[in-house]
Amino acid sequence: TVEGILQISNEGYGWIRTGNYMEGDNDAFVHQQIIRNLGLRPGDSVLGMVGPARVNSKYPPLLQVTQVNGGEVEGLKDRPRFKDLTPIFPNQPLTMEHGKDSITGRAIDLVAPIGKGQRGLIVSPPKAGKTTILKRICQSITINNPEVHLFCLLVDERPEEVTDMERSIKGTVVASTFDMPAENHTVVSELVIE
């Protein structure tokens, strides 16, 4: 059995990435026929059965898909594509303030309010406090909005900051640290967006 996130190559075949959206020893190869027949897309969470590894292959092949994104396998081809959806302004606010000591959250609510479905990019020089602010945002979202499934993508960060974030928030932390190639940053970011 294998469970992970599907990454699809330009040639049409793919891999189930089991280790934090990146290549790992427990990954599985997915033939393009399975991807095409089921209507699988990059970023899908796939659960399935693998066969024995082939002699000339690095990863064992995926033989059968049991679940996709926690649900049934049927009807995946009918899903709307993200790029075809109508973009709208966020109309449900995510309150950042929680308690009297939440100064960062209060400031964000006043200066740059955040809404459900909104994406954000924080860019700043090193040691400016961006990771601390991002940690506070993630903590506020999980405290004030427990129904939200939180993803936190860290790109070009130090491994220590990734570990701190994983320990500090309740949600999925996906990271491509500064010691990884720029190509890896792009691949991981695209998988999370999908």
Regions found by a protein language model. Give the residues of each.
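Phosphate-binding glycine-rich loops and their immediate beta-loop-alpha structural context
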Residues: 87-89, 93-189
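N-terminal "pre-motor" subdomain/linker immediately upstream of P-loop NTPase catalytic cores
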Residues: 1-78
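Conserved RecA-like P-loop NTPase ATPase core
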Residues: 14, 156, 192
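Short solvent-exposed strand/turn elements
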Residues: 79-88
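Hydrophobic alpha-helical segments
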Residues: 11, 186-189, 193
